[in-house]
């Protein structure tokens, strides 16, 4: 399921460590033994610590070794003023289980896992954000099936994973087509199962992001519903979020701040080193062809870094409302409770110093 790696600041080497047993329990779904994170102090007006004491460590729940790779290739990993351990997971729900068990401190995720964290009573505020092309997600069509419009989704078997950005994309697609969840067959799967399920015809439709879109299209007879149809179903937002207990701890909250800054600088490095990123990550790590790697990088567009402000909170609330309208949330939640806006100052500084942008440039 995952491979842990521990890094020490200033060292280029990597050592493999046994992940905490509690993380294993988390990924197996043993959730009943852990308590929800509950704020013990109001951090909104508490100054964000900046001093990272020696010996501070963060456990980062990564996906596809992506954050670990971008930090390493950009040179930011060696600059981190704390020890970091990476554990690789598949999908936001598995990461939430690790958070619940206290087996991870911070993680990169899509825009939906933080919503389900709120609904589950887990206090895991967003501390950083990035924006990529909304066209990066595709509705993939299985071989031998026909679907060229969103109206064609009616009656189809659609891969569906609660607590993921793909969940919101499916619900928005149905709403845009004037369909309800009862008009289709939602096949509940793990994200890791989506690609094989659609290319083998176990489902008719699956929402995929790269590199799985490119992998799918290698299968004869597969296709995607055109972007002109799917515009607006995926926001392209991704986040860094951390357990509240971590953001309330002076040492770890300062370490998270350093990670947020490195996150911005590392992805801005991708913006200016696209070919190198394509080769080192997608070709060497994800094992796609050089041609496919270039296609993937182009599809994601330029990374930008939104302010952590009311505008972003409102965007997140709109996603919450879309999921709630479909009856897919157990209770009403407020996006405002899922952010730690203190980290915006660090985002703003890192954007200015690295030459990055807060918003995509208009074409």
Predicted regions and their residues:
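Bacterial N-terminal signal peptides that target proteins for export
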Residues: 2-20
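Pocket-lining segment of extracytoplasmic ligand-binding domains
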Residues: 112, 192-285
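Short, glycine-/small- and polar/acidic-enriched structural segments
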Residues: 39-180, 185-188, 204, 210, ...
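C-terminal motif of bacterial Sec signal peptides marking the signal peptidase cleavage site
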Residues: 28-32
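Conserved C-terminal helix/tail region of periplasmic/extracytoplasmic solute-binding proteins
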Residues: 321-363
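Bacterial signal peptide processing site
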Residues: 34-37
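Solvent-exposed, polar/charged alpha-helical surfaces in well-ordered, non-transmembrane soluble domains
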Residues: 69, 97, 101, 115, ...
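Secondary-structure end/capping motifs
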Residues: 249-330
């Amino acid at each position: 399921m995952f491979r842990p790696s521990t890094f020490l600041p200033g060292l280029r080497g990597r050592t493999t460590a046994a992940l905490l047993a509690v993380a294993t329990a988390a990924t197996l779904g043993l959730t009943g033994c852990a308590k929800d994170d509950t704020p013990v102090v109001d951090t909104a007006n508490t100054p964000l610590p900046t001093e990272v004491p020696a010996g501070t460590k963060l456990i980062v729940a990564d996906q596809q070794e992506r954050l670990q790779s971008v930090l390493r290739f950009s040179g930011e990993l060696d600059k981190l003023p704390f020890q970091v351990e990476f554990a690789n997971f598949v999908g936001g729900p598995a990461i939430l289980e690790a958070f619940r068990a206290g087996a991870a401190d911070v993680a990169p995720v899509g825009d939906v896992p933080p919503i389900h964290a709120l609904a589950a009573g887990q206090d895991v505020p967003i501390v950083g954000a990035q924006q990529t092309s909304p066209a990066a997600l595709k509705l993939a069509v299985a071989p031998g099936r026909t679907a060229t419009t969103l109206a064609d989704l009616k009656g189809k078997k659609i891969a569906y994973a609660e607590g993921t950005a793909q969940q919101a994309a499916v619900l928005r697609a149905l709403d845009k087509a004037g369909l309800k969840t009862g008009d289709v067959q939602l096949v509940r799967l793990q994200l890791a199962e989506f690609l094989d399920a659609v290319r083998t015809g176990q489902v008719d439709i699956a929402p995929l992001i790269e590199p799985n879109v490119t992998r799918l299209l290698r299968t004869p007879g597969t296709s995607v519903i055109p972007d002109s149809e799917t515009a607006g179903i995926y926001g392209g937002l991704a986040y860094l979020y951390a357990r509240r207990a971590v953001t309330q701890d002076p040492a770890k909250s300062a370490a998270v701040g350093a990670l947020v800054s490195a996150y911005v600088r590392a992805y801005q490095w991708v913006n200016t080193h696209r070919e190198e990123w394509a080769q080192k990550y997608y070709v060497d790590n994800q094992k796609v062809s050089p041609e496919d790697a270039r296609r993937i990088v182009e599809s994601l567009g330029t990374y930008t870094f939104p302010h952590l402000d009311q505008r972003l909170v409102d965007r997140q609330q709109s996603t919450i409302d879309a999921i709630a309208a479909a009856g897919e949330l157990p209770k009403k939640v407020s996006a405002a409770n899922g952010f730690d806006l203190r980290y915006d100052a660090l985002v703003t500084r890192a954007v200015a110093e690295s030459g990055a942008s807060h918003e995509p440039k208009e074409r």
